From Swiss-Prot:
Residues 6-133 form the RNase III domain. Digests double-stranded RNA. Involved in the processing of primary rRNA transcript to yield the immediate precursors to the large and small rRNAs (23S and 16S). Processes some mRNAs, and tRNAs when they are encoded in the rRNA operon. Processes pre-crRNA and tracrRNA of type II CRISPR loci if present in the organism. One of its GO terms (cellular component) is cytoplasm. Gene3D superfamilies: 3.30.160.20, Ribonuclease III domain. Pfam families: dsrm (PF00035), Ribonucleas_3_3 (PF14622). One of its GO terms (biological process) is regulation of gene expression. It is found in: Cytoplasm. This is Ribonuclease 3. Mg(2+) binds at E46, D119, E122. Belongs to the ribonuclease III family. It comes from Clostridium perfringens (strain 13 / Type A). PANTHER family: RIBONUCLEASE 3 (PTHR11207:SF0), RIBONUCLEASE III (PTHR11207). GO terms for molecular function: double-stranded RNA binding; metal ion binding; ribonuclease III activity; rRNA binding. It is an enzyme of class 3 (hydrolase). The lineage of its organism: Bacteria, Bacillati, Bacillota, Clostridia, Eubacteriales.
Length: 237
């Protein structure tokens, strides 16, 4: 892949970086780093960005929705920061176009993959925080997540299928929900996870994803579809 056009990326996210290297790292997938020695990739930045995102969203919700209980705020935050929401924001910013990855990863659809785009966005958030500080990072997050926050507040989106399934089942009494990782296959940078969801020892949903979290969400989604709680779709989370 060609070098990242940093000028384009900075225009898209609305921030000019002092340290260009941290932005490049944020947009580098592990599969790319596996091909070249001494190339940093975005996994550690993703870890930091997740915490920065959680903090900024939590502070915003706490300050602006004083009528909401702790439980309600927790549920709203979960919707805002979940992988699917991150993917939507990442797509809006066209980050997928600029992620450095191996040719093999790209040929298997990596550029459009939910987990890769979501991870890259978290890494970019960390890069903004490290380069510009918490205030600029907070502004960046609120500017790009405002629509997601509004939809979560208005209950227009259900993104956390595991939580939704638990709520549906608890209405009918106590149930035993188990997510069983059946297998995983593929190389480390392109590994697929397969999960069975058991409700009272009966398989009610099966999910596949490029992370354990994604496969569990897809299994929960399949169970909700089977129970008639959401419509059947071809696309997974």
């Amino acid at each position: 892949m060609k070098d990242i056009n940093l000028i384009e990326v900075e225009k898209l996210i609305g921030i000019e970086f002092e340290n260009k290297g941290v932005l490049i790292t944020a947009l580098t997938h592990s599969s790319y780093a596996n091909q070249f020695k001494d190339v940093k990739y975005n996994e550690r930045l993703e870890f930091l960005g997740d915490s920065v995102l959680q903090l900024c969203v939590t502070k915003y919700l706490f300050n602006n929705y004083k009528d909401k209980s702790e439980g309600e705020l927790t549920k709203i935050r979960a919707l805002v920061v979940c992988e699917n929401s991150l993917h939507k924001v990442s797509k809006n910013l066209s980050l997928g176009k600029y992620i450095r990855m191996s040719k093999g990863e790209e040929l298997t659809g990596g550029r459009e993959r939910t987990s890769i785009q979501a991870d890259a966005l978290e890494a970019v958030i960390a890069a903004v925080y490290l380069d510009k500080g918490i205030e600029v990072a907070n502004d960046f997050i609120l500017r790009n997540f405002k629509d997601v926050i509004d939809k979560a507040i208005n209950e227009e989106i259900i993104l956390d299928f595991k939580t939704r399934l638990q709520e549906v089942l608890q209405k009918n009494g106590e149930v035993n929900i188990v997510y069983n990782l059946v297998k995983h296959e593929g190389p480390p940078h392109r590994r697929k996870f397969f999960t069975d969801l058991l409700i009272n020892n009966e398989i009610m949903g099966q999910g596949v994803g490029f992370s354990k979290k994604e496969s569990e969400q897809n299994a929960a989604k399949a169970a909700l579809q089977r129970l008639g709680e959401i419509k059947w779709e071809k696309d997974t989370i």
